[in-house]
Amino acid sequence: TGESFTQLTDFARDLGKTTMMSAQESAEAMSFLGMAGWDTTQIMAGLPNILNLTVASGRDFATVADIVSDNLTAFGMSADESGRYTDALAYAMSNANVNMDTLGESLKYIAPVASSAGFSMEETVSAVMALGDAGIKGSQAGTTLRTVMLNLTGANEKATAKLKELGVEIFDSSGKTRSFNAIIKDLEKALDGMTDAQKTATLNTIVGKTAISGFSTLVNQGADKLNEYTKGIRNSSGATQEMADTMG
């Protein structure tokens, strides 16, 4: 509408004055988000966060906007929550061996599955961080976590039987998926006392040979590391702005 166009034009002009992007670049950014299906209110709520993440990551706006808009949808999050998401990504880049490209590639594979399986965005990003620290990044991290989360939540009969045998509960009494980190913690306890060969065989039964390397890494690093990262993400409000200020 005419009113929306005026709002966005004024907003682009303001961003041109208050950010490193020109009014023209801001307008192009808005057009991109509009094509992604965002309305005027969503664009005005989310754009400043994406602009900051663009500066913080050193990547081009189109790449960052594509990653953020796609992943928000995949995680079932709204544009109003874009700040929470960009802060999570900024925290990840500052604290683990990952960057914008590897994060985007990983989350493309795992975000839809994590959301439908009932695992939180924060725990999912934490798992990607932990894998990145071990040199497992991008699509390899994404496909590994996709297999892990699917098999943990019942996609594979052998995995379900093995988890039951180990006494590892995936769902709580109300049928809701338990915390990913809590499940990893219980797996750690269940594997305690086994030989390395027994641990490998057990984890292989749960996730299969293509995901065993990454899954073993997560379990060996332990839930404490995942919890540390998850806590950091949950307390990361303002991380995007802070990182953009540093990089800018």
Which ranges hold each PLM region?
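Short amphipathic alpha-helical segments that mediate assembly, nucleic-acid/protein binding
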Residues: 5, 24-26, 196-199
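Amphipathic/coiled-coil alpha-helical interface segments used
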Residues: 1, 16, 72, 79-152, ...
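Gly/Ala-rich hydrophobic membrane-inserting helices
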Residues: 25, 29, 63-65, 141-145, ...
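Carboxylate/His-rich catalytic cores and anion/metal-binding grooves
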Residues: 48-75
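Short extracytoplasmic
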Residues: 1-15
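Solvent-exposed, membrane-proximal periplasmic/extracellular interface segments of envelope transport
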Residues: 20-22, 28-43
